[in-house]
């Protein structure tokens, strides 16, 4: 491969950092009418200003810095410009990831675009992608622009800080999927926590501090077991490089120890039953962009980690303890599904729905069958599109217009916002896993893989289909119909803006198009998953 193509992966990490530097170092001002004045052009509109002031109050109640020149020209801090810069940077990164996808050879199950960087730190950094990580890279670069669009108008204070955190999260998330060293994987895996902590702590709702500490403590304590397992691997093999570890065949006793440590860390990140309190609080209290990144990408880190650390390196332990994973997954599905039926908070309902679907793709990948593993990846990607769209609708449209997340306040929204209701209906069907959506293909293949291994638990896991239909249809029916709309929302609920429509229709097209043509993803996955199953069997026999 040409040398200039090899730099694409490095560019994926550098472009957001360049965007961070531009936003941090540049003062964005817009020239307005001559001072004094009382009206401003869009997007500032009416302001309140006094003579000699160095700040003014915008129409939404926020304050903006003012610069007065000798000619009485006035410059006001432009909060839209840095948002545009961040959005352009994220779109540019999406274009680079699409180039990597186009140039990727899916008939080769080895790592490609491999880069070695010796001069960036005291530690050698290896970057590369294979037929599995390429899809998670694409998912990340797709979701970040959606997250930036979601809070376009609702974030009015500390805008630069918010944008810097979002671009920093993109860099760290991409690094997790690109590094070829398990120690660096752990470092970037944990480096995501401080930005999330600050994001929720600064821009969250009323209980944001409590939620930020929950997510930090839960995931940090869980990841200590992952660090212990990685250090054990390193001491045994003398390396932390992926390719070298793939040639290992750990003793069964060591495999059990490593499996327990790694699975605990990923069970917290998925999350599973008894370990999901942090996710619910984080989703409910997080700003909309944080919820979208959390549901769309962060929850997929455990799925990716299972493919990197458990399935190829610990085959015998993962095969022998499959039934325990299945039991945990089934209990999580049933618990989360019942919890959705009793909650009155829309955001909390979608958070519980995420826990239920995460349990389905968890048991799918641990089925150790080609269908189950491929289905688990498909369902993870589908959830990465559907869940952010639902959060966008309830947090970026309904909540921004009404100021409440309580379900019983909403009814008859279809009368005021038919386009919003139509897209809400499409994503509710996708969340149910109906045919012609990517969710259906992923859920069907995941459950099929479970049926092949343990039919009884597969039957219990299939209850997720019934439960997801129950809470998704209930939510849509209650919000879109359910009688005449409340007079409280008569003047506040309006239909989708162009920004909201473009973001939601883009995700909707992806979910439906890939549901009709899933071979676009499955053909690329098949070589890597088949190779994984083959090496799996060889190591199991040798062990």
Curated annotation (Swiss-Prot):
Enzyme class: translocase
UniProtKB keywords: Electron transport, Membrane, Mitochondrion, NAD, Respiratory chain, Translocase, Transmembrane, Transmembrane helix, Transport, Ubiquinone
Signal peptide: none
Membrane topology: Multi-pass membrane protein
GO MF term list: NADH dehydrogenase (ubiquinone) activity; ubiquinone binding
E.C. number: 7.1.1.2
Keyword NAD on entry: yes
Function: Core subunit of the mitochondrial membrane respiratory chain NADH dehydrogenase (Complex I) that is believed to belong to the minimal assembly required for catalysis. Complex I functions in the transfer of electrons from NADH to the respiratory chain. The immediate electron acceptor for the enzyme is believed to be ubiquinone.
UniProt name for this protein: NADH-ubiquinone oxidoreductase chain 4
Organism field: Neurospora crassa (strain ATCC 24698 / 74-OR23-1A / CBS 708.71 / DSM 1257 / FGSC 987)
């Amino acid at each position: 491969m040409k040398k200039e193509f090899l730099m694409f992966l490095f560019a994926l990490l550098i472009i957001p950092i360049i965007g961070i530097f531009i936003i941090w170092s540049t003062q964005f001002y817009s020239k307005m009418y001559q001072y004094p004045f009382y009206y401003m052009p869009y997007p500032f509109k009416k302001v309140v200003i006094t003579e000699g002031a160095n700040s003014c109050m915008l129409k939404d109640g926020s304050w903006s810095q003012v610069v007065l020149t000798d000619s009485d020209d006035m410059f006001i801090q432009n909060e839209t410009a840095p948002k545009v810069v961040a959005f352009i940077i994220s779109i540019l990164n999406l274009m680079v990831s699409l180039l990597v996808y186009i140039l990727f050879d899916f008939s080769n199950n080895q790592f490609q675009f491999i880069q070695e960087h010796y001069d960036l730190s005291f530690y050698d950094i290896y970057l590369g992608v294979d037929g599995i990580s390429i899809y998670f890279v694409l998912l990340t670069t797709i979701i970040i622009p959606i997250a930036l669009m979601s809070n376009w108008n609702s974030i009015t204070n500390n805008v630069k800080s918010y944008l810097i955190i979002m671009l920093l999260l993109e860099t760290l998330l991409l690094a997790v999927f690109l590094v070829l060293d398990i120690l660096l994987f752990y470092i970037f895996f944990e480096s995501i926590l401080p930005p999330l902590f600050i994001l929720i702590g600064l821009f969250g709702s009323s209980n944001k501090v409590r939620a930020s500490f929950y997510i930090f403590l839960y995931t940090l304590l869980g990841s200590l077991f992952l660090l212990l397992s990685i250090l054990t691997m390193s001491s045994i093999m003398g390396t932390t490089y992926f390719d070298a570890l793939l040639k290992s065949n750990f003793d069964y006793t060591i495999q059990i120890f490593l499996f327990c440590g790694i699975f605990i860390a990923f069970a917290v990140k998925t999350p599973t039953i008894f370990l999901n309190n942090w996710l619910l609080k984080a989703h409910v209290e997080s700003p909309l962009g944080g919820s979208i990144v959390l549901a769309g990408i962060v929850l997929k880190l455990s799925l990716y980690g299972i493919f990197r650390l458990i399935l190829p390196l610990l085959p015998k332990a993962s095969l022998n303890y499959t039934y325990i994973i299945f039991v945990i997954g089934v209990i999580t599905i049933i618990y989360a599904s019942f919890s959705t039926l009793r909650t009155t908070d829309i955001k909390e309902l979608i958070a519980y729905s995420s826990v239920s679907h995460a349990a389905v793709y968890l048991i799918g990948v641990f089925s150790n069958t080609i269908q189950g593993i491929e289905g688990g990846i498909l369902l993870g990607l589908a959830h990465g599109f559907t869940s952010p769209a639902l959060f966008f609708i309830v947090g970026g449209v309904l909540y921004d217009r009404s100021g409440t997340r309580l379900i019983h306040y909403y009814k008859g929204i279809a009368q005021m916002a038919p386009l919003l209701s139509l897209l809400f209906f499409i994503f509710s069907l996708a969340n149910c896993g109906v045919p012609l959506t990517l969710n259906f293909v992923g859920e069907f293949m995941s459950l099929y893989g479970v049926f092949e291994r343990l039919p009884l638990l597969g039957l219990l896991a299939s209850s997720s289909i019934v439960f997801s239909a129950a809470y998704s249809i209930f939510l849509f029916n209650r919000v879109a119909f359910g009688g005449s709309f409340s007079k409280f929302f008569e003047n506040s609920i309006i239909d989708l803006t162009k920004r909201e429509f473009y973001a939601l229709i883009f995700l909707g097209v992806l979910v439906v198009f890939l549901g009709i043509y899933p071979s676009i993803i499955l053909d690329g996955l098949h070589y890597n998953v088949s190779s994984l199953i083959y090496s799996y069997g060889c190591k199991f026999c040798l062990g």
